[in-house]
Amino acid sequence: MKQEIIDRFTRYAKVDTQSTEASNTVPTTEGQLELGRILVEELKALGLTEVTMDDNGYVMATLESNTNKEVPTIGFLAHLDTATEFTGKNVNPQVHEYNGGDIELGHGYVLSPKQFPELAGYEGHTLITTDGTTLLGADDKAGIAEIMTAMDYLIKHPEIEHGKIRVAFTPDEEIGRGPAHFDVDAFGAAFAYTLDGGPLGQFQYESFNAAAAKVSFYGVSTHPGTAKNKMVNAIKRAIEFHSQLPANEAPEFTEGYEGFYHLLSMEGNADFAELHYIIRDFDRQQFANRKAKMEAIAWEMQEKHGKGKVSIELRDQYYNMREKIEPQKEIVEVALEAMEKLGIDPKVGPIRGGTDGSQLSYKGLPTPNIFTGGENYHGRYEYVSVDNMEKAVHVIVNIANLVAQRAK
């Protein structure tokens, strides 16, 4: 199975599927459609039915039930796109039999346990890394490879009882648009799981409440030599705004259940400047308070500098899926039992981020998140353990079987 996983993953990783905020098309990039078409053909070749890809790039397929029991339909999902933070073009995956120490990625870059201490725990594993020039795309092509391999395994092992299984691969998850055009009714599952987590055993059914903010500043540009009492520097107004947010409530200073404000980008000149933020908090009231604080700062600056000099736009992105999953704890219990049967110690904790499941849970499809085996996502030091990918495959298989066993 390991070689199948390696072959699938490296094949998918080589397709450039980075999404982009700059596009309003669905999906936002052609590469996602390219990978979707590849998966459609592979799903058909495996023997799945009802294989579709719609105009928006959503791929869906069915593995039919092999039992006469009335088993609820379950789903497994992963996303097609890779992150925007680092290039995903010309990905060249490297396979290593890791025996400890540093890994030479190439181009002068080294993956070292001195910088990434968790690497030492992977001694004896088969690892896939980058060549140092791109991200790897294990987020979330590891999840795609695991779902595909699990479906193949179930087809080849008809003695493993399971109900109807739906799989889906979604575009634009990394920019928060994954579920925007996802047809929950057409998918037809009672509940689902995303394969979009990190290290072995990770299981998550709590996510941030999330919003985006755009703050605009309007200045007056004049020649700096004759600017006295005339120039209004919009960049300085932007700095003034940012300085009023709590400095210690940023990603680099927070962990666990702590929320934050994150300045994603700053652009502009003396005439006009713009700040782009994301706002995150697990608690719904604290989330509301954070948004209110940003609005209050903008309002105070309006009062100080004049109307029309500062504007703010806030947009909610997704909410904490715990509110939708906790009432159906059997979804969690089945996944944890599936891991424990493999000797995996489940590591249940919050996602300091979001998945497609965050939004899908609010669209009527409760969807917690399962590990894929990857580390250091979104950069050149990203890697994934093939050994732990294989365990993720068996978690999928066990979930399908346990749901069938629990049915009458």
UniProtKB/Swiss-Prot annotation:
Reaction(s) catalysed by this chain's protein: Release of the N-terminal residue from a tripeptide
Stored PROSITE patterns: ARGE_DAPE_CPG2_1, ARGE_DAPE_CPG2_2
Subcellular location per the Swiss-Prot or TrEMBL entry: Cytoplasm
First-level EC class: hydrolase
UniProt-listed NCBIfam families: peptidase-T, PRK05469.1, PRK13381.1
Annotated EC: 3.4.11.4
PANTHER family: PEPTIDASE T
GO biological process, one term: proteolysis
Keyword Zinc appears in the UniProt entry: yes
Any Pfam family: Peptidase_M20
Principal location class: cytoplasm
Requisite cofactors: Zn(2+)
Signal peptide residue numbers: none
CC per GO annotation: cytosol
Cofactor annotation remark: Binds 2 Zn(2+) ions per subunit.
Positions with a binding annotation for Zn(2+) 1: 79, 139, 196
GO molecular function: metallopeptidase activity; tripeptide aminopeptidase activity; zinc ion binding
Name the record gives this protein: Peptidase T
Protein task: Cleaves the N-terminal amino acid of tripeptides.
Gene behind this protein: pepT
Catalytic site: 81, 173
Residues binding Zn(2+) 2: 139, 174, 378
Sequence similarity: Belongs to the peptidase M20B family.
HAMAP family for this protein: Aminopeptidase_M20
InterPro entries named in the record: ArgE/DapE_CS, Bact_exopeptidase_dim_dom, Peptidase_M20, Peptidase_M20_dimer, Peptidase_M20B
Key words of the record: Aminopeptidase, Cytoplasm, Hydrolase, Metal-binding, Metalloprotease, Protease, Zinc
